C-alpha cells in the first residue's frame, strides 16, 4: 500500500479525531507552510479553515503519513473535490521522534477560491 504525506491544519491537528477518521494514519512530524496564511472562508453551512498564498506569512502544520484508505476518508471529510481541492508541494519536515529534517512531497486540502472570505 502506497504511503503519502498529508499536511494538517485546523481540526485535523486533533490526534484523536484523526485516528477516528483515518485509523491507519500516523503523525510523523511538523512543518511550516511558507508564504501561506490561515483564514476562515464560508459556505451556507458555516465557516471553515483554509490556507491561501500570502507572501511573508507562514502556517505551522502537522504531517501525517497516510494510506490510500486514509486519503479516501479525508477526501470525504473535506468535501473533495467540491469544497476543497488538493495541492501537492515539497516541504522540509521535522521528524517527531528524531528531530531530523527531511524533504517530502506532501498534499494539502485548500478551499476553492470562489467561496466567501469571512472577516473576523
Where in this protein do the model-derived segments appear?
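Glycine-aromatic micro-motifs
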Residues: 1-118
Amino acid at each position: 500500500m502506497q504511503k503519502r504525506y498529508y499536511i494538517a491544519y485546523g481540526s485535523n491537528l486533533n490526534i484523536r479525531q484523526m485516528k477516528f477518521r483515518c485509523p491507519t494514519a500516523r503523525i510523523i512530524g511538523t512543518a511550516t507552510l511558507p508564504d501561506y496564511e490561515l483564514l476562515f472562508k464560508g459556505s451556507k453551512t458555516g465557516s471553515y479553515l483554509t490556507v491561501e498564498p500570502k507572501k511573508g506569512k507562514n502556517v505551522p502544520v502537522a504531517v501525517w503519513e497516510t494510506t490510500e484508505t486514509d486519503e479516501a476518508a479525508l477526501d470525504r471529510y473535506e468535501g473533495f473535490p467540491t469544497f476543497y481541492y488538493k495541492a501537492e508541494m515539497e516541504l522540509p519536515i521535522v521528524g517527531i521522534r528524531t528531530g531530523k529534517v527531511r524533504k517530502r512531497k506532501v498534499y494539502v486540502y485548500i478551499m476553492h477560491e470562489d467561496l466567501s472570505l469571512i472577516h473576523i
